[in-house]
Amino acid sequence: MVLPTVAIVGRPNVGKSTLFNRIAGERISIVEDVEGVTRDRIYATGEWLNRKFSLIDTGGIDDVDAPFMEQIKHQAQIAMDEADVIVFVVSGKEGVTDADEYVAKMLYRTNKPVILAVNKVDNPEMRNDIYDFYALGLGDPYPASSVHGIGTGDILDAIIEKLPVEEEEINDNTIRFSLIGRPNVGKSSLINAILGEERVIASPVAGTTRDAIDTHFTDQDGQEYNMIDTAGMRKSGKVYENTEKYSVMRAMRAIDRSDVVLLVINAEEGIREYDKRIAGFAHEAGKGMIIVVNKWDLLEKDNHTVAKWEADIRDQFQFLSYAPIIFVSALTKQRLNKLPELIKKISESQNKRIPSAVLNDVIMDAIAINPTPTDKGKRLKIFYATQVSVKPPTFVIFVNEEELMHFSYLRFLENQIRAAFTFEGTPIHLIARKRK
């Protein structure tokens, strides 16, 4: 599902990040404590009254070296470009400032709904001071203390009320994929080459985000695809377009909307920290993954080049051991014909279901090879396992005590399941549950 976007804006020190964390709460989860698997705190998923939304802390995107008003303008511009709903945070302690008025004028000219959150209203006596904020012309101010959690519910109610109506999903048989990576890795060239290679009739479809143009196409076998454009990547003249955090945010939004993610690496430049960061987010989100090394034609190669690259990738991306690696050239079209079929194969892995009887045979065989562990004289007992969902495939293993299921044994079972059923290109999740 494509989530609507809520952006938090406001001058420094009004409590934007505190409000962000209060709304996001514990919903930001690190699935595995593995080096390179991180989630950027400027982007999270919020939920209230059974409605989910993407949450952006624009303050996290600031260039701290930029002039004060440039930072403010920068935030407001991102919010206007990206958000369905804008939460404008001001400080009840300091009252209306020139910077607040500056942002209010920018936001007033947009057609986006704006919620005026007066933060740092830490005691009832201060509520009388919020009426000054009506002068900003943005409607009713919502008093809040994000530190204490006061008023957050009212702000969330207002957010939900102003979110756009939920949109229907694309045809379930459509495979949604995106190409992500640092600037200048050749994403645009790859997109154009893929479309040309498939000789498809591609039609631009207005995306659910403001500036996204997705490309819907059908291959020669009748399989439908939706190629998700990382919105705004091609826009020019934006001061913030080349900042890494903004690029990360764009990539994260594309990942959220994708079934399969193609991580594009520049063969000339090698693997960078950005690549691992984005790959970690896609892994956590349970997306299918392909590691695409582009500009392969520009490297001088010998008989060991491919093996060296594969070894380095496996070392740098240890959490992506399931992801296939493909070396391509958008310029010469080398191996591009293999990409659509690989995307399709990984989508099938993401949607694969294993009958419980067959799954439990594999689990029992695994236990015979490597008996369950013991702790303080008590042995882990596995009663049965079942698959509970797809995208990614998720399995629940019912046991006598959850605490006895050591991470290493869970990983062993995952490897046995992968050996039996392949699951190429997709993470799989195993969850231990105590049998009731």
UniProtKB/Swiss-Prot annotation:
What is the gene name?
Answer: der
Q: Which organism is it from?
A: Streptococcus uberis (strain ATCC BAA-854 / 0140J)
**Can you give the residue ranges of the KH-like domain?**
352-436
What does the subunit section of this Swiss-Prot or TrEMBL entry state? Associates with the 50S ribosomal subunit.
Q: Which CDD domains does the entry mention? A: EngA1, EngA2
Kindly give the Gene3D superfamilies that the UniProt entry links to this protein.
Answer: 3.30.300.20, P-loop containing nucleotide triphosphate hydrolases (3.40.50.300)
| Residues the entry annotates as binding GTP 2 | 181-188, 229-233, 294-297
Under the heading HAMAP family, the entry gives: GTPase_Der
Q: Name a single GO biological process.
A: ribosome biogenesis
Describe its function: GTPase that plays an essential role in the late steps of ribosome biogenesis.
Coiled-coil residues: none
Give the family, as the similarity comment puts it: Belongs to the TRAFAC class TrmE-Era-EngA-EngB-Septin-like GTPase superfamily. EngA (Der) GTPase family.
Location of the EngA-type G domain: 4-167, 175-351
Q: What PROSITE patterns does the annotation carry? A: G_ENGA (PS51712)
**GO molecular function annotations of the record:** GTP binding; ribosome binding
> What is the protein name for this chain?
GTPase Der
Assigned keywords, A-Z = GTP-binding, Nucleotide-binding, Repeat, Ribosome biogenesis
Binding sites annotated in the UniProt record for GTP 1: 10-17, 57-61, 119-122
Q: Which domain of life is it from?
A: Bacteria
Pfam families found in the cross-reference section: KH_dom-like (PF14714), MMR_HSR1 (PF01926)
